[in-house]
């Protein structure tokens, strides 16, 4: 078993240089080995390649560009990460691909019947990438140059968002609740300033974002695709740009009555304050006012039932009971990057399944609105899964929204931990990208029941639970409408019709779905995830949510059934790319999924 837990006590430039040098040496050694092969079999060609991909279990170190408290380390690791991504291109050159193609067209056909289903599925899924050869009609050098440019620009975009923030200081008189959270700012002109500062901050990256979009389109053209969205959807459940646009249009038709209802409610609040035209910077404030009014449950009243340490422990215990795991904390200062980070060993009976890092408290060196899960190591013959759950909670008390977020991100971690793959590229997190959110959304909504809430906070009054769950369901029309705006913006960015970003582009999409109110300084630059590997991926939250609700419907009245929980683990969480996700869902449900559960929630 490879060493999968990294030493974070030394992230000096010297160590990073040594890691990069080792990576380059091993890459060149594998290239030389492959080019010298005369006997091409799975064991001589494919297995060494897979072992090589498993041998770089330092992805957790690259995450330190976002998580380490030392700014110098963050910057050094950001450069290391960029170099690492660019170096990946070196192994997949034409000479190496020629060897893979020779194997694919000769010996693989002979030995296919002797390979495991996992090996066959892997080869079918990745053989095009591994064995594609430049026949002289394709500009491989151009593709590689564009990939390097895209990666470099994406790193620049992310660095801008991670290291630079608006910093206007307001007086206590200007901030009604002492918070710069826009949903708590009563004075409209202050709300506008706060929103426009963030938009100015984000807009600084628009030319860079445009260049990334154009470079991706150039790559798509080189590959023979009409647009980048066609490339990005290859191998997904939804498959094509046309199918995705059809799904979004149908979703809009289905959701429009609820979007219009919620926007009308918000406009009425604004009119009561003398505001004739609701603007985007007004919405968070009136959204909170409406929820507080209907639930009569203040945030502070809600939060007092969820003290940080007790809540985290109770949530972890719920996952233990439901999935049949145990979590044990490992105390080793070298294995964490900050004293607030917890490292958990996950076991099933006495067998270690993997490890989960919890870096979930806001602190110096972390972006204030980060809520992520990253699988830094995937399951294989030589590795166990390692996940990092990265959130920015205040460490005092949880809101219910915080709790849902933690369930969601822990759901991703359990998806990774539960993998039974022997090839890392077939592990749970390599399922179709438009299914990967379904398990985490399952857990996010699993906690939306009185049974689970009473386990999280024993003794919580029933009327508080009623208020919390009512609050969680309010204004879903607006929330899904905003999701549709993001989906449409994502598709616009990555379509062949994209000519550049503009207020007109943003307004037309925003107005069609939410009915106007996009302020003239707001280019709606909420698309940074598009430049972090999420391009043409916004739709997957809504698409996978319909599947998550189907899975969740089986647990109605049986939320803590451990037998059912373990069957969910084995049939859904553990499978990953070992079989099509639809097959896993059908095996668990005992039927084809439909939109029944989703429509029930919407209505």
Regions found by a protein language model. Name each.
Residues 60, 225, 411-421, 449-454:
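Long, well-ordered alpha-helical segments
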Residues 1-178, 182:
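N-terminal helix-rich structural modules
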Residues 136-137, 141, 200-211, 218, ...:
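A conserved hydrophobic secondary-structure block that centers on an alpha-helix together
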Residues 8-19, 42-46, 204-205, 244-251, ...:
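Membrane-entry segments of alpha-helical transmembrane domains in multi-pass membrane proteins
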Residues 34-38, 64-72, 193-203, 231, ...:
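Membrane-interfacial helix termini and the short, flexible loops that connect transmembrane helices
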Residues 118-131, 148-189, 210-392, 436, ...:
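Active-site-proximal, well-structured secondary-structure segments within enzyme catalytic domains
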Residues 393-407:
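Short pre-active-site segment immediately N-terminal to the catalytic Zn-binding motif
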Residues 2-22, 28, 34-36, 124-127, ...:
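C-terminal, non-catalytic "cap/extension" segments appended to globular domains
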């Amino acid at each position: 078993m490879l060493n999968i837990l990294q030493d974070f006590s030394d992230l000096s430039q010297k160590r990073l240089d040594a890691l990069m040098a080792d990576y380059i040496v091993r890459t060149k050694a594998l290239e030389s080995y492959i080019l010298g092969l005369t006997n091409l079999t799975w064991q001589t060609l494919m297995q060494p390649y897979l072992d090589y991909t498993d041998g770089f279990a330092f992805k957790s170190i690259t995450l330190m560009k976002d998580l380490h408290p030392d700014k110098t380390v963050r910057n050094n690791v950001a450069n290391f990460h960029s170099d690492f991504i660019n170096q990946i291109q070196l192994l997949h050159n034409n000479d190496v691909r020629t060897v893979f193609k020779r194997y694919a067209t000769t010996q693989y056909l002979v030995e296919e019947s002797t390979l495991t289903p996992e090996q066959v599925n892997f080869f079918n899924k990745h053989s095009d990438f591994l064995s594609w050869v430049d026949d002289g009609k394709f500009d491989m050098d151009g593709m590689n140059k564009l990939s390097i440019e895209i990666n470099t620009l994406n790193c620049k975009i992310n660095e801008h968002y991670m290291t630079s923030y608006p910093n206007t200081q307001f007086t206590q008189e200007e901030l009604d609740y002492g918070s710069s959270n826009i949903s708590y700012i009563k004075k409209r002109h202050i709300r506008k300033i706060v929103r426009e500062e963030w938009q100015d901050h984000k807009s600084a990256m628009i030319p860079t974002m445009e260049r990334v979009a154009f470079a991706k389109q150039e790559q798509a053209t080189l590959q023979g695709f009409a647009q980048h969205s066609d490339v990005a959807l290859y191998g997904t459940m939804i498959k094509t740009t046309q199918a995705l646009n059809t799904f979004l249009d149908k979703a809009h038709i289905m959701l429009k009555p609820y979007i219009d209802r919620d926007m009308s409610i918000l406009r009425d609040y604004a009119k009561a304050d003398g505001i004739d035209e609701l603007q985007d910077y007004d919405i968070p404030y009136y959204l909170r006012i409406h929820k507080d009014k209907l639930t009569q449950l203040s945030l502070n009243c809600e939060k007092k039932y969820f003290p940080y340490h007790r809540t985290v422990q109770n949530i972890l215990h719920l996952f233990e009971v439901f999935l049949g795991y145990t979590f044990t904390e490992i105390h080793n200062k070298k294995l964490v990057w900050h004293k607030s980070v917890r490292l958990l060993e996950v076991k099933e009976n006495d067998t270690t399944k993997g490890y989960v890092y919890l870096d979930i408290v806001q602190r110096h060196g972390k972006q204030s609105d980060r809520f992520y899960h990253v699988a830094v190591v995937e399951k294989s013959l030589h590795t166990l899964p390692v996940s990092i759950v990265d959130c920015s909670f205040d460490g005092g008390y949880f809101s219910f929204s915080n709790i849902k977020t933690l369930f969601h991100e822990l759901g991703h971690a359990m998806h990774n931990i539960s993998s039974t793959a022997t090839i890392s590229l077939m592990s749970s997190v390599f399922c179709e990208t438009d299914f990967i959110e379904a398990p985490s959304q399952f857990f996010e909504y699993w906690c939306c029941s009185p049974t689970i809430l009473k386990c999280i906070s024993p003794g919580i009054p029933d009327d508080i639970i009623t208020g919390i769950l009512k609050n969680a369901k309010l204004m879903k029309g607006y929330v899904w409408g905003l999701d549709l705006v993001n989906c449409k913006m994502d598709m616009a960015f990555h379509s062949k019709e994209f000519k550049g970003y503009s207020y007109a582009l943003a307004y037309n999409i925003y107005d069609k779905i939410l009915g106007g109110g996009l302020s003239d300084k707001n280019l709606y630059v909420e698309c940074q995830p598009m430049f972090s590997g999420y391009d043409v991926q916004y739709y997957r939250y809504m698409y996978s949510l319909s599947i998550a609700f189907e899975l969740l419907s089986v647990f109605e009245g049986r939320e803590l059934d451990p037998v059912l929980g373990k069957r969910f683990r084995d049939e859904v969480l553990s499978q990953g790319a070992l079989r099509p996700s639809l097959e896993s869902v059908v095996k668990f449900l005992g039927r084809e999924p439909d939109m029944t559960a989703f429509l029930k929630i919407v209505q």
